[in-house]
């Protein structure tokens, strides 16, 4: 595995966390990061917990072919409930919050200033089929980086 670094280093007081090679969908991870970018930390936590509980949908803005409309979405009709990816993003967010508290930042003033995904390794796999054939069954991975900034 190659070395991963953070894409940006912001000015001022910040905390950051990274989830490396998480076995989740890259498309779901990208849409979730786009949805929570700019939110306050507490609102983002609530949003992700509601997605896991199937109460709020994540708007799918890019990868929305054959995605049904969901009630409750404002400004964008297509959405889904990517639970597995939401759990992974929530873990990264909780790590970033812990890092912020360790650095002495106030949780009430934290905003998700940067949330981004990067493509990770693809783990090759094969599924045996009839007549001695095999079908590829690969596992894609995603690296998520999150930077929390303190607003005044």
Swiss-Prot record:
Entry keywords, A to Z: Ribonucleoprotein, Ribosomal protein, RNA-binding, rRNA-binding
CDD domains (alphabetical): Ribosomal_L22
Keyword RNA-binding: yes
BP GO terms, sorted: cytoplasmic translation
Gene Ontology CC: one annotated term: cytosolic large ribosomal subunit
GO MF terms, alphabetically ordered: rRNA binding; structural constituent of ribosome
Family matches, as NCBIfam families: PRK04223.1 (NF003260), uL22_arch_euk (TIGR01038)
Family designation: Belongs to the universal ribosomal protein uL22 family.
Function, as annotated: This protein binds specifically to 23S rRNA. It makes multiple contacts with different domains of the 23S rRNA in the assembled 50S subunit and ribosome.
Subunit and partners: Part of the 50S ribosomal subunit.
PANTHER family, A to Z: 60S RIBOSOMAL PROTEIN L17
Name of the protein this chain belongs to: Large ribosomal subunit protein uL22
Gene: rpl22
């Amino acid at each position: 595995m190659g070395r991963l670094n953070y894409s940006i280093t912001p000015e001022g007081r910040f905390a950051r966390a990274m989830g490396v090679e998480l076995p989740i969908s890259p498309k779901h991870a990208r849409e979730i990061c786009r949805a929570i970018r700019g939110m306050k930390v507490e609102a983002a936590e609530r949003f992700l917990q509601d997605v896991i509980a199937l109460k709020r949908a994540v708007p799918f803005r890019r990868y929305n072919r054959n995605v049904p409309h969901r009630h409750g979405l404002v400004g964008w009709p297509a959405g889904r409930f990517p639970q597995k990816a939401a759990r992974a993003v929530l873990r990264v967010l909780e790590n970033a919050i812990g890092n912020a508290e360790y650095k002495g930042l106030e949780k009430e003033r934290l905003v998700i200033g940067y949330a981004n995904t990067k493509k990770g390794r693809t783990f090759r796999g094969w599924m045996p089929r009839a007549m001695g054939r095999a079908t590829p069954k690969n596992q894609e991975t995603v690296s998520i980086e999150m930077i929390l900034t303190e607003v005044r």
